[in-house]
Amino acid sequence: MAAEIPTSVIQKLVFFTGAMIIFPIFTFFVCQYLFSNNALISGGIAALMANVVLIGYVVVAFTEDTSSLADEKVETKKDI
């Protein structure tokens, strides 16, 4: 009894997982280059970018249309 997860949900999860890994690391090293090896500033900005990615994921998750999924569940219950 595996749950059927829509492919759009998996695609969003994979995208934001990659963004959570790549974006803060990229930001850290760019800031290291720009601010002449100041690890405190680079780390702080990288942490901020990780939070931006997380907030973006939450916003996308809340705005996702789930009404079609609920309709499919009701239809399958009627068929039984």
From Swiss-Prot:
Ranges annotated as spanning the membrane: 15-35, 40-60
Topology of this chain in the membrane: Multi-pass membrane protein
Motif Prevents secretion from ER: where in chain: 77-80
Lumenal compartment spans: 36-39
Pfam families in UniProt: VMA21 (PF09446)
Subcellular location: Endoplasmic reticulum membrane; Endoplasmic reticulum-Golgi intermediate compartment membrane; Cytoplasmic vesicle, COPII-coated vesicle membrane
UniProt name for this protein: Vacuolar ATPase assembly integral membrane protein VMA21
Organism: Scheffersomyces stipitis (strain ATCC 58785 / CBS 6054 / NBRC 10063 / NRRL Y-11545) (Yeast)
Gene field: VMA21
